[in-house]
Amino acid sequence: MAAAAAAGAASGLPGPVAQGLKEALVDTLTGILSPVQEVRAAAEEQIKVLEVTEEFGVHLAELTVDPQGALAIRQLASVILKQYVETHWCAQSEKFRPPETTERAKIVIRELLPNGLRESISKVRSSVAYAVSAIAHWDWPEAWPQLFNLLMEMLVSGDLNAVHGAMRVLTEFTREVTDTQMPLVAPVILPEMYKIFTMAEVYGIRTRSRAVEIFTTCAHMICNMEELEKGAAKVLIFPVVQQFTEAFVQALQMPDGPTSDSGFKMEVLKAVTALVKNFPKHMVSSMQQILPIVWNTLTESAAFYVRTEVNYTEEVEDPVDSDGEVLGFENLVFSIFEFVHALLENSKFKSTVKKALPELIYYIILYMQITEEQIKVWTANPQQFVEDEDDDTFSYTVRIAAQDLLLAVATDFQNESAVALATAATRHLQEAEQTKASGTEHWWKIHEACMLALGSVKSIITDSVKNGRIHFDMHGFLTNVILADLNLSASPFLLGRALWAASRFTVAMSPELIQQFLQATVSGLHETQPPSVRISAVRAIWGYCDQLKVSESTHVLQPFLPSILDGLIHLAAQFSSEVLNLVMETLCIVCTVDPEFTASVENKICPFTIAIFLKYSNDPVVASLAQDIFKELSQIEACQGPMQMRLIPTLVSIMQAPADKIPAGLCATAIDILTTVVRNTKPPLSQLLICQAFPAVAQCTLHTDDNATMQNGGECLRAYVSVTLEQVAQWHDEQGHNGLWYVMQVVSQLLDPRTSEFTAAFVGRLVSTLISKAGRELGENLDQILRAILSKMQQAETLSVMQSLIMVFAHLVHTQLEPLLEFLCSLPGPTGKPALEFVMAEWTSRQHLFYGQYEGKVSSVALCKLLQHGINADDKRLQDIRVKGEEIYSMDEGIRTRSKSAKNPERWTNIPLLVKILKLIINELSNVMEANAARQATPAEWNQDDSNDMWEDQEEEEEEEEDGLAGQLLSDILATSKYEEDYYEDDEEDDPDALKDPLYQIDLQAYLTDFLCQFAQQPCYIMFSCHLNDNERRVLQTIGI
C-alpha cells in the first residue's frame, strides 16, 4: 500500500475526495460481481459514470496491484483497467472514447503498474501485462523510456512470476509494435530472447517457448518493413539469424523431457518456417542441417501420433502453456506441415520436397488416418461427421492438414506425386495385410486413409495409369481392396469410405463392376445401415452422377434411380442441417441425370422440396439448395406445368401474407425462388407467372419496408423484363396500369432518398436492363429515373451502391452518348455546376475500385468511348472538367503513422478529366494483363526444376523483382482481382443478362491495347503523355508505346 499511497501523494489528488471516489469504485466493482441481476445492472451503469473521472484509471491500477485486496475485486479491476487503457489512453486509438487520460494520471499509472507484473496470481499478472503493453504501444519510448530496463531487470531477477509477467508484456507488445518502434526494440529484445531460449537450466520450457514466439513475431514484422524500407532486415535481424538458427537445430534434436516437449518444438518449427519464408537467401546454408532434423521430427512424430491419437494404444499428458492452454501434440504436426508448405512456396527449396516425395507421401497417409476420438464423435453425431469430412469444412484436424499437404504437392508436382502416391499406397496396403494377419483390430484405418488419399487426387492417378506413367494395379485396387472391404464388417467408416472411393474411379471400371458398386451404394442408403454408411452412400451417389455425366454413360444409373430417390427422401426425413444439405445437393444432381425419369417423379420431388423449404425457411443454405432443385425442374419442359401449379400458389401466398404472420426473411427467399423459375423458363411464360406471380411480387416490393425483400423484388422484376418484356407490357391491372408502370414504381421506390441506401445495391442492373430492353418506350420516364439516380448518388456511401448507380451511366455511354451528355449538362449537380461534372468526378475516383469482370468491361470500354468522343468531337463539356488526380506526399514525411495522418490531411493534384480517363484506362490494362498472366501461369510452368541455378543469384536481381509490389496501394492490389476468374465463384457471371451482352465476350486486354495504340498515334497524345507517371509509362512500354 505504501507505493500506492506515495503515488497518490505524487499525483496531488486531494485525500478525502479521492478516497470517496475509490470507495465508490470498490462498491461498484462489488456490485458488478453480485449474483443479483438488478444490483449488477445498476453497478454496470454506475461504472460508466465513474469511467469519465480523472482518477478512475489510477484507482483501478491501485486496486489491481494491492496485495491486501480481495482477489475477485483485483481480478475485475485488472480486466476493466485493460479496457480503460484501450479506450481512453490515446485519442488516436481506433477504440478511443473521450475523455483522454490526463498526463498526471498517466504518470501515476505507469509508476504503479509494473509492480503487478510480479504478482503471484496469474490472471491478474496477465491483465496487467496486457495493460502495460497497450500503454507501451503509445508511450514507449518517448513517454516511458525506462520501461524496457524494468522488463530486462525482471527477466534476470530469478523471480518466476516477474519473468512470466515481463514475457507476457513483450509477447503482446511485439504483436502490436509499430515500424517506427521496431528499430529500437529488435536490438534490445532479440539478444535477450536468445539468452532466455538457450538457458535451459535457468528458464522453464514455457518461458523459453515464449522467447521463440517473440523472435518469430519480430521476424515477420521486420520482413514486412523490408518491403518499404530496404536494409531493415540487414540491420535488425541478420546479425542474430545465424545463432538463433543453430540454437533451433539443437532444440529440435532434444528428446522430450524437462527441457523440451511438443509445445516447445512447435514454437521452434514456427520460427524456422518464418525464416525460410521471409529470408530464404539467409537460410540456404543452414538447410543441410535443418532438413534432416525436421524430417526426423516428422517421422518420429508419425509413429507417436499413431500410437497416442489414431489408435489410442498409449496415453500421454499434453503440455499446458503458461496461460493454461493445452498444447495438443497435433500442434507440432501442424507446424511440421507448415514448414513443408513454406518449402513448396520458395523456388530455392522446392526441389528438396520433390526429392523426398515417395517417403513424404507415405507419412502423409499415416497422418490421414481416422483417430479413435473422431470415431467416437462421428458415431454419436452424424451431423459432425458430414461437417468435418466436407471439402469446405471449417474444422482443422491433422487428417485435414495432411490432406491439404497432399493436394499441395500434387498440384506442384503432378507426375512425380502420382508415382510417389502409387508407391506409398501399395506399401501401406501390403503392410496392412501383415497387421491384419497378426490380428490387430486397427488395420482398416490404413485402408481407409489410402482410399481417401487416392480418391482426393483421383485425376492425377487415373491420367498417369492411362498414360502408362505409373504401374499401379487399378483393377486390383478396385476389386481386391475396395470391393473386398465392402464385404467386411471391420468398421462402418471403412464401408463408407469404400463406397465413396469407388465413385471416384468410374473411368477405370467395366460396366459390370460399376453395376456391382452401384448395387452396394443403393444398399448403403438403406435405413438399417449406420448413419455414417448412409451419408457416405449419398456422397458416392453424387460422385457417380457427376462422373457418369462427364463420360456420357448415365444409362448405367437409370435402373437404380427409383431406389436412389426413395433412399434420399427417407434420409432427409430423419436428419436436419448438415445431413439434409448433403441430401438436397445430391438430389439436385440426380434430377439432371435423366429428364424423363425426373418428369415421372416430379410429383415426389417437388412437394418434398417445397416442404423442406417451408420447414427450414430460416436456413439460407437449405433455401438456396431448394432453389437449385427448382431451377433444374424449370429447365425440364415436362416438369414446368405441374411444378408451377404446386409452387407458384405457395410463393404467392407467402408474398401476400402480412409480415408479422410469416418468419422473417421468408418473403425475400420466396421472391428469389420465383426469380429462378422465371429465369429458367422459356418464354412465353404461363398465365400463372404473368397474371398471379408478377402482380404479387410487384405489390409486395412496393409495400414492404424490408431491404432484402425490396432488393430481391427488384431483381425478380429485372428477370421478368429480361425474359419477356412484351408479356409484362401487355398485362394490365384493373386500374389500367400495365406491368411496365409497376416496374417504374419499383425503380422509384428503390431510388427513393428516404429508403436505406442498400436497397439500391442492384438497382443499376434493373435500370440498365430496362433501358436496353425498353429504351424507346420509356420516354419521359428515363429522365425521371436518371434524376433519381443522381440524387441517390449524393447520399450513397458504400462502394457497391455507388458502383451500381454509376454503371447505369456507363451503359448509357455505350448506347445513347450524346443524349446522355446533353441531359447531364442540363441539370445542376450538388455544387451548382452541371451534373456531368459530379458524375465524372464520382466515377473516376472509384473506377479502380470497381469489382466484377462484366462491370469492369462495361465501365472500361465506356471510358474509352468518352475519351475518344472528347477528342474527336472536341467536346468542351468534357474538356473543361477537372478532377482529382493523384495524392501528394511530402518528401520529408517518412512513414505515415496514425498521428501524422491525423495532423496532415490528404492532398491531391487537380488534372483534366480526359487525362484522368487515360490514366484509368492504362490502370485497367495493367490489371487485366496481370490477371491474364496469373491465369496462364499453370503449374506446369512452375514445375521446371529451376532451384539449382538460383542459389547463387545476385542481391540486386531479387531487389528489383520485389520493387513491383511495394509501390502499390492496397486498393490497387484489391483491384487486380477484378478480372481473375476464380475470384467470384458464382455471383455475377451467373447473371444471364451479363452473359447475353456482347460486351461480356470482349477480350479486354486486346481491346484496351488496340485503343491505346491508336490513341498514341493522335496528335493530341503529346499533351497527355506529359501527365503520365513512371508506372503508367512502363505499362505502355509493354504494349510497344
UniProtKB/Swiss-Prot annotation:
Major location category of this protein: cytoplasm
Location(s) in or outside the cell: Cytoplasm; Nucleus
Domain of life: Eukaryota
Keyword Methyltransferase attributed: no
InterPro entries: ARM-like, ARM-type_fold, HEAT_IPO9_central, Importin-beta_N
Biased composition, class Acidic residues, residue ranges: 943-964
Keyword annotations of the record: Acetylation, Chaperone, Cytoplasm, Nucleus, Protein transport, Transport
Region (Disordered): 936-967
Residues found modified as N-acetylalanine: A2
Domain Importin N-terminal stretches: 43-119
UniProt xrefs under Gene3D superfamilies: Leucine-rich Repeat Variant
Single annotated GO MF: small GTPase binding
GO CC annotation terms, alphabetical: cytoplasm; nucleus
GO biological process, one term: proteasome localization
Quaternary structure note: Interacts with histones H2A, H2B, H3 and H4. The binding is coupled to RanGTP cycles. Interacts with AKIRIN2; promoting association with pre-assembled proteasomes. Associates with pre-assembled proteasomes; interaction is indirect and mediated via interaction with AKIRIN2. Interacts with PPP2R1A and PPP2R1B.
Functional description taken from the UniProt entry: Nuclear transport receptor that mediates nuclear import of proteins, such as histones, proteasome and actin. Serves as receptor for nuclear localization signals (NLS) in cargo substrates. Is thought to mediate docking of the importin/substrate complex to the nuclear pore complex (NPC) through binding to nucleoporin and the complex is subsequently translocated through the pore by an energy requiring, Ran-dependent mechanism.
Protein name: Importin-9
Upper taxonomic lineage: Eukaryota, Metazoa, Chordata, Craniata, Vertebrata
